[in-house]
């Protein structure tokens, strides 16, 4: 319903892969994609715990990775407004069979690709950046020209400001940014044009899209 971006990564050498943020309706498409490529899905990786990013995580039947501060949301969309839970039919959600917590500062491998985990709260308590050599999965921390909302339950505008001042600001300009919604961008472009990032050293940060 919210046009969430779901990313699938398949290692062509090992035919193993993972998906990032499988929202509502993603599971059948993910299964079809992996079948077409004769690949094995080994992990679901979540940038945060909002329903539009996690709805089909358990349906894929593999290990689910999420920051511990958002793990409670895997329980039928815990912590979100009732209208969101109804929109995503949260009452019918199954909890994942196996959950691994993403820890700030750790390096973790998915399907042969290394990612650094950077905690970047604000949009949600457990939002993370997943940083590789050439790209970052930014979830709803930063989008092209905007940032994640901070008017939701468990959002925190002050924490978002600090994330923009620290973890986001520190990302290398060369990185491609693969956000949770909207088109891809680069850190170089966002540093030059994103008004929320540019104002991150002031107190005038407001939630964007």
Question: At which residue positions do the language-model features occur?
Answer:
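Residue-level detector of beta-strand structural context in well-folded domains
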Residues: 7, 100, 105-106, 128, ...
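Residue-level marker for buried hydrophobic side chains located in beta-strands
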Residues: 18, 45, 64, 137, ...
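Active-site HxH/HxHxD metal-binding segment of metal-dependent hydrolases
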Residues: 24-109, 192-200
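Metallo-beta-lactamase
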Residues: 25, 39, 79-84, 113-209
